[in-house]
Swiss-Prot record:
Note: Major glycoprotein, comprises over 80% of the envelope proteins present in virus particle.
Lineage: Viruses, Riboviria, Orthornavirae, Negarnaviricota, Polyploviricotina
Glycosylation site list: N24, N38, N54, N79, N97, N181, N301, N499
Any single GO CC term annotated in Swiss-Prot or TrEMBL for this entry: host cell plasma membrane
Lipidation positions, renumbered (S-palmitoyl cysteine): C555, C562, C565
Protein's job: Binds to sialic acid-containing receptors on the cell surface, bringing about the attachment of the virus particle to the cell. This attachment induces virion internalization either through clathrin-dependent endocytosis or through clathrin- and caveolin-independent pathway. Plays a major role in the determination of host range restriction and virulence. Class I viral fusion protein. Responsible for penetration of the virus into the cell cytoplasm by mediating the fusion of the membrane of the endocytosed virus particle with the endosomal membrane.
Record family assignment: Belongs to the influenza viruses hemagglutinin family.
UniProt name for this protein: Hemagglutinin
Length: 566
């Protein structure tokens, strides 16, 4: 009896198992999408980690290690700072009248002339850097009653004592230093930058030896501004054998304005003016070497590609650069949701569609068909739905780059010690800006990823619905992304379904007839469950009957004795 029940159970399972293609009068057609063994995790709005078939890194995290000299004109400061080149330090004479897009200052740069300070150093440096030129025009200033072209052993030009080439050190002539009053109009149509200075002697004796008066004064004026400087006499730390100093100042004279210089001593006079230009030139501190290459974006670490929308190499940039963010990585989904293919599909090797898993090895497209029929099995891509998805995804990266790439430079921020509060505020604003951009970048990528996954899922569903509408009652949805076709469907028939030329009316009668025949003997999963339960109950009942009969027989034969104690 048990043998009969077991065989009945196996027979039922066999009848309940679908054999795609095992009947010449039916076929199975499955729809699926591309999958890879190991996908890439991306972030979406609804999921922190979702696996996709392909993704593109959006954050540039490394530089080339060198500053490219094309397309930007790079001027290497070598041993000179921009201000030393501006003043005309003897070892910076090679920079006279130079131009640049980006002036690169090196950490090894040094001054090699009379010790000086610039009270508004950062502003002057930024002003000259943005002008992009050291073009200098000499002017005929008349300094009557004084000696010109003073020099110092601390500023040698060759073997001789020298001075800054763009400045004129004036001191007494004989025993007199008259009051100087010189004017210079700007009759041109551009701004002129005048550099001048005030000498601070280390002792009163040095003051009178050079300028006669015990205390000098320098006043420089235009129609828009006036600066009056009184020298501060006193000893300072020794630099290149000197304890005196020069303070450097600057004045911009606009077209139609006039420069007025008045002094009774201590004047370091201008020799002319620098021609100011408007532009987007800049300056950057960097020790990266300058190489022969092409790059639109430059950082102190070196040039970086700008084919990504974000970078975390350096906050300081020049050129058309990716936006700086805090994240080390942001991945943009450029493929669909990845569901790796199951390697085994049961004892009969049935195929399955997109609802269960993806398909690996699809090289001709993202979406496609697999079939089993009387001629065997096959697979083909659906190029139309694949192209529809690709067309919408292809432009995503370019659109993100267009939204984020900066077409201007982010300059270094410098403040003097007395501007500490301003510097703190600026740093807070800059950090807040970076935080906001980092958040916006993550949100933007998550939104784009969500859209990509929804889009690719939608294309799969569109293809499935298109196939369902073609087959109509000639096939049954198996619930796993496959259709069981109730008529003979050879490879030509399968091809007509794929390309949209399938005529369901041609196969309607055959499909209807086969459906009724198959349904008459096909056991649904619900009936199989009932058979399993009934078989189990009968088996248990028979086992109990056999066991009880054995016990009764053994008792009668005396092989088993039962004692009941109270």
């Amino acid at each position: 009896m048990k043998t009969i029940i077991a065989l009945s159970y196996i027979f039922c399972l066999v009848l309940g198992q679908d054999f795609p293609g095992n009947d010449n009068s039916t076929a199975t057609l499955c729809l699926g999408h591309h999958a890879v063994p190991n996908g890439t995790l991306v972030k979406t709005i609804t999921n922190d980690q979702i696996e996709v078939t392909n993704a593109t890194e959006l954050v540039q995290s490394s530089s080339t290690g060198k500053i490219c000299n094309n397309p930007h004109r790079i001027l290497d400061g070598i041993n000179c700072t921009l201000i030393d080149a501006l003043l005309g330090d003897p070892h910076c004479d090679g920079f006279q009248n130079e131009t640049w897009d980006l002036f690169v200052e090196r950490s090894k740069a040094f001054s090699n002339c009379y010790p000086y300070d610039v009270p508004d150093y950062a502003s002057l440096r930024s002003l000259v850097a943005s002008s992009g030129t050291l073009e200098f025009i000499n002017e005929g200033f008349t300094w009557t009653g004084v000696t010109q072209n003073g020099g110092s052993n601390a500023c040698k030009r060759g073997p001789d004592s020298g001075f800054f080439s763009r400045l004129n050190w004036l001191y007494k002539s004989g025993s007199a230093y008259p009051v100087l009053n010189v004017t210079m109009p700007n009759n041109d149509n551009f701004d002129k930058l005048y550099i001048w200075g005030v000498h601070h002697p280390s002792t009163d004796q040095e003051q009178t030896n050079l300028y006669v008066q015990a205390s000098g004064r320098v006043t420089v004026s235009t129609k828009r501004s006036q600066q009056t400087i009184i020298p501060n006499i006193g000893s300072r730390p020794w630099v290149r054998g000197l304890s005196s100093r020069i303070s450097i100042y600057w004045t911009i004279v606009k077209p139609g304005d006039i420069l007025v210089i008045n002094s009774n001593g201590n004047l370091i006079a201008p020799r002319g003016y620098f021609k100011m230009r408007t532009g987007k030139s800049s300056i950057m501190r960097s020790d990266a070497p300058i190489g022969t290459c092409i790059s639109e974006c430059i950082t102190p670490n070196g040039s970086i590609p700008n084919d990504k929308p974000f970078q975390n190499v350096n906050k300081i940039t020049y050129g058309a650069c990716p936006k700086y963010v805090k994240q080390n990585t942001l991945k943009l989904a450029t493929g669909m949701r990845n569901v790796p293919e199951k390697q085994t599909r049961g004892i009969f090797g049935a195929i399955a569609g997109f609802i269960e898993n993806g398909w690996e090895g699809m090289i001709d497209g993202w979406y496609g068909f697999r079939h089993q029929n009387s001629e065997g099995t096959g697979q083909a891509a659906d190029l139309k739905s694949t192209q529809a998805a690709i067309d919408q995804i292809n432009g995503k990266l370019n659109r993100v780059i267009e939204k984020t790439n900066e077409k201007f430079h982010q300059i270094e921020k410098e403040f003097s010690e007395v501007e500490g509060r301003i510097q703190d505020l600026e740093k807070y604003v800059e950090d807040t800006k970076i935080d906001l951009w980092s958040y916006n970048a993550e949100l933007l990528v998550a939104l784009e990823n969500q859209h990509t996954i929804d889009l690719t899922d939608s294309e799969m569903n569109k293809l499935f619905e298109k196939t369902r509408r073609q087959l109509r009652e000639n096939a049954e949805d198996m619930g796993n992304g496959c259709f069981k076709i109730y008529h003979k469907c050879d490879n030509a028939c399968i091809g007509s379904i794929r390309n949209g030329t399938y005529d369901h009316d041609v196969y309607r009668d055959e499909a209807l007839n086969n459906r009724f025949q198959i349904k008459g003997v096909e056991l649904k999963s619900g009936y199989k469950d009932w058979i399993l339960w009934i078989s189990f109950a009968i088996s248990c009942f028979l086992l109990c009957v056999v066991l009880l009969g054995f016990i009764m027989w053994a008792c009668q034969k005396g092989n088993i004795r039962c004692n009941i104690c109270i």
